[in-house]
């Protein structure tokens, strides 16, 4: 395992659930911004190495805390919303991104995971294709009756930019096809060769025009010209590697389908190879990496795909990535520089995050002057359990440090050279008070992060909460971004979300008017007021996410919205669950104390009596509400406690209630598939499944509109019980819930 992977896993292991949730939120925001810069603006502010390692840390935390995975998780994001200036095209099948492998050990893990999912033994032949990952711009070409009718960029995966006129100017893209299916969407990568890129930049320089930073930027900028004649003048190329909607199968295998595309006239990468083991895949990866500089175009890794298309169908998709493919990325780069200072930033949840200020250094073609230091343990050279990292070397101001382009919120400091440490340097003393409001900053047991206790009196937290409220996945108010929110807060115009909806009332007329602020006018002020009024009607999952409740990301917000469907129902259950949440806290504390006492006394811990005692006086309605909350698939005790804590804090609850009064319509979630026998039903799988794995069963049930829960309750409709079902099967019988065998379930969904 590589050093960056080890560090990422060590950091993830040291996180408490609260700290992990906070970190995932930070990563999600930074990567969302990077996606917009990369896909929509053709002006990336992170290199591929930065971006990939950002996602690597996110993946490590998600692996350690799978229940905390967010709806806006970087591993679930595809591209960015289409830019203004182009009409939009909706993809009939989403253009997905790929999961990443960053280390050689990830590849056999990927293969083993697929074998487990498909219930394939080690002896079963399992071919993969391995092809270079082109560093360009993804494009989808739609052909109907052999004619090119449209071309669209990836966009956000669901909707892309209509670049049909520009695509027609690319020589590698056929205008007509012979003997093609009636409907065929061909997907691939628009790119520019090294030679063509150099020649283009020479012409740009001679004309006094802007030159491009790299071939990828040149290709993306050229394809996304509003004037197709400019695109025609640029030497763009296209490799086909996949397909979307197709009216007739291209082949039975990935490799066969690529050959079909080649026969139809598309350029297929000739370094694509079929491999029969992880060892073959890694050998081909090494071969391509060795030849990388001589290929004549940029690549940033190798893509592995299951060759058998029936297996691809069975494996299916995650939210934004296929289970049957992975991109094995080339390693990032390192550089050494001097740590000039350590600054402390305060986040939305009060987390104190140390940031290294560095002597600027070029790492992989990008100048880096800031890097993350994660938390106080990382600076001290230890993990959250006290174990050493970096061989226990601490980090001090003045040190010579190694910067890894891991793309945290910023790149990260990976190592320190003690031989070059200046004399008389002092160990860094992490602050125990908030640098913004001077409130005490405490570190709770089990938490890797120190947090400001100031709450809403802390300006840093208040501003970050407001920024979160207007973020893209929350209320997403047109014309009201982070910059405007911060300015309004600093001037005393807004202090909480409800104030946003009173801006027109307070600053539309009178002495202090929005239209008279610098940078504003009559038209822009009116547009903002209208945009705010438009968001008085909001989807329930967006409202829940916008509140910025700790541990409640987009995934949890969507799960809660689907389960409760109305704000009133959610609020009532959370309120009713308050005594149970307190009992849960008491039980956790009691169990921890009992474990410690048992260890000190050399005896076996007696945990259940401690839990029973803590829960003894809890009212039954509170227990039922708690079971309702924690029984939602993906919503555990950590999220439930966080919800209750927020709702029980008088100031927070009053702020939420004021917001609710400003809203006119809270929309229930859109219904999932309704044309199946199990749509809308809550299903629990228990025991051993023989025809499919648990993951496959869950994915197929959800695809048919069912809701899969991890626990049996009165709201459960069906329990699918295999051998060894145990207590869940018994509870289903006691509650009179329909029990099905695996065969009966498959018969019910029409897949026996």
UniProtKB/Swiss-Prot annotation:
GO biological process terms held by the UniProt record: DNA repair; DNA replication
Cross-referenced InterPro entries: BRCT_dom (IPR001357), BRCT_dom_sf (IPR036420), DisA/LigA_HHH (IPR041663), DNA_ligase (IPR001679), DNA_ligase_AS (IPR018239), DNA_ligase_CS (IPR033136), DNAligase_adenylation (IPR013839), DNAligase_N (IPR013840)
Positions that bind Zn(2+): 434, 437, 452, 458
Organism of provenance: Jannaschia sp. (strain CCS1)
Basic and acidic residues bias (residue ranges): 599-615
Keyword Cell division assigned: no
Family: Belongs to the NAD-dependent DNA ligase family. LigA subfamily.
Enzyme Commission numbers on file: 6.5.1.2
Name of the protein in question: DNA ligase
Catalytic reaction annotation: NAD(+) + (deoxyribonucleotide)n-3'-hydroxyl + 5'-phospho-(deoxyribonucleotide)m = (deoxyribonucleotide)n+m + AMP + beta-nicotinamide D-nucleotide
UniProt-annotated catalytic positions: 133
Residues noted as binding NAD(+) in the record, renumbered to the chain: 48-52, 97-98, 131, 154, 189, 305, 329
Record keyword Nucleotidyltransferase present: no
GO terms, molecular function: DNA ligase (NAD+) activity; metal ion binding
CDD domains, sorted: BRCT_DNA_ligase_like, LIGANc
Residue ranges of every copy of the BRCT domain listed in the record: 673-752
A cellular component term, taken from the record's GO annotations: cytosol
Function summary: DNA ligase that catalyzes the formation of phosphodiester linkages between 5'-phosphoryl and 3'-hydroxyl groups in double-stranded DNA using NAD as a coenzyme and as the energy source for the reaction. It is essential for DNA replication and repair of damaged DNA.
Key words of the record: DNA damage, DNA repair, DNA replication, Ligase, Magnesium, Manganese, Metal-binding, NAD, Zinc
Domain of life: Bacteria
Name of the gene this protein is made from: ligA
Named cofactor requirement(s): Mg(2+); Mn(2+)
Cross-referenced Pfam families: BRCT, DNA_ligase_aden, DNA_ligase_OB, DNA_ligase_ZBD, HHH_2
Disordered: annotated span: 599-618
């Amino acid at each position: 395992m590589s050093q960056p992977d080890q560090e990422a896993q060590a950091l993830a292991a040291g996180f408490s659930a609260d700290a992990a949730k906070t970190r995932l939120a930070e990563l999600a925001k930074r990567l969302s911004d990077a996606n917009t810069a990369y896909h929509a603006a053709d002006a990336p502010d992170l290199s591929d190495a930065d971006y990939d390692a950002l996602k690597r840390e996110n993946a490590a935390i998600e692996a350690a805390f799978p229940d905390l995975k967010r709806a806006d998780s970087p591993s679930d994001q595809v591209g960015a919303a289409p830019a203004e200036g182009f009409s939009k095209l909706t993809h009939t099948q989403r253009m997905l991104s790929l999961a990443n492998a960053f280390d050689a050990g990830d590849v056999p893990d990927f293969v083993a995971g697929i074998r487990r999912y498909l219930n394939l033994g080690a002896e079963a032949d399992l071919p993969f294709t391995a092809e270079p990952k082109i560093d360009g711009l993804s494009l989808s070409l739609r052909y109907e009756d052999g004619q090119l009718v449209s071309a669209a960029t990836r966009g956000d995966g669901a909707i892309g930019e209509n670049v049909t006129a520009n695509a027609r100017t690319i020589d590698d893209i056929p205008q007509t096809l012979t003997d093609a299916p009636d409907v065929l969407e061909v997907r691939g990568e628009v790119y520019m060769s090294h030679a063509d890129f150099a020649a283009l930049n020479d012409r740009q320089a001679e004309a006094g025009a802007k030159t491009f930073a790299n071939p990828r930027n040149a290709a993306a900028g050229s394809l996304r010209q509003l004037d197709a004649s400019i695109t025609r003048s640029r030497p763009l190329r296209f490799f086909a590697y996949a397909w979307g909607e197709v009216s007739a199968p291209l082949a039975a295998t990935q490799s066969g389908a690529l050959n079909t595309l080649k026969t139809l006239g598309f350029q297929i990468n000739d370094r694509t190879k079929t491999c029969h083991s992880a060892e073959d895949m890694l050998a081909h990866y090494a071969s391509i990496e060795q030849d990388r500089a001589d290929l004549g175009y940029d690549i940033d890794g190798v893509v592995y795909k299951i060759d058998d298309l029936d297996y691809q169908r069975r494996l299916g998709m995650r939210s934004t990535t296929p289970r049957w493919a992975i991109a094995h990325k080339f390693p990032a780069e390192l550089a050494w520089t001097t740590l000039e200072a350590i600054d402390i930033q305060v986040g939305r949840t009060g987390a104190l995050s140390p940031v290294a200020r560095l002597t600027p250094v070029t790492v992989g073609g990008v100048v880096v002057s800031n890097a993350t230091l994660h938390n106080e343990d990382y600076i001290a050279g230890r993990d959250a359990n006290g174990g050493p990292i970096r061989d226990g070397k601490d980090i001090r101001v003045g040190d010579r440090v190694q910067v890894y382009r891991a793309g945290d919120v910023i790149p990260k400091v990976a190592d320190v050279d003690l031989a070059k440490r200046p004399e008389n340097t002092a160990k860094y003393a992490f602050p125990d008070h908030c640098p913004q409001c001077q409130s005490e900053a405490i570190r709770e047991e089990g938490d890797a992060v120190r947090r400001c206790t100031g709450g809403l009196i802390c300006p840093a937290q208040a501003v970050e909460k407001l920024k979160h409220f207007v973020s893209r996945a929350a209320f997403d108010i047109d014309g009201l971004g982070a910059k405007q929110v911060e300015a309004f807060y600093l001037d005393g115009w807004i202090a909480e979300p409800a104030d946003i909806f009173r801006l027109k009332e307070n600053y539309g007329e009178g002495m202090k008017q929005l239209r008279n602020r610098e940078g504003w006018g009559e038209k822009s002020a009116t547009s903002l007021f209208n945009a705010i009024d438009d968001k008085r009607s909001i989807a329930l999952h967006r409202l829940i996410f916008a509140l910025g409740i700790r541990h409640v990301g987009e995934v949890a917000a969507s799960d809660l919205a689907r389960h409760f469907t109305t704000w009133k129902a959610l609020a009532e259950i959370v309120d009713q669950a308050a005594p149970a949440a307190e009992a849960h806290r008491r039980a956790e504390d009691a169990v921890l104390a009992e474990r410690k006492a048992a260890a000190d006394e050399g005896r076996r811990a007696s945990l259940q009596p401690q839990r029973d005692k803590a829960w003894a006086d809890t009212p039954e309605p509170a227990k039922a509400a708690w079971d309702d909350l924690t029984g939602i698939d993906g919503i555990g005790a950590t999220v439930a406690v966080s919800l209750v804590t927020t709702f029980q804090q008088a100031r927070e609850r009053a702020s939420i209630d004021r917001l609710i009064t400003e809203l006119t319509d809270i929309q229930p979630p859109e219904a999932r598939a309704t044309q199946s026998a199990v749509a809308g039903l809550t299903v629990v799988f228990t025991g051993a499944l023989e025809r499919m794995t648990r993951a496959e069963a869950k994915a197929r049930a959800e695809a048919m509109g069912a809701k899969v829960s991890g626990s049996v309750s009165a709201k459960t409709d069906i329990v699918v019980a295999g051998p060894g079902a145990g207590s869940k099967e018994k509870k289903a019988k006691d509650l009179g819930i329909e029990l099905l065998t695996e065969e009966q379930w498959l018969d019910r969904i029409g897949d026996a």
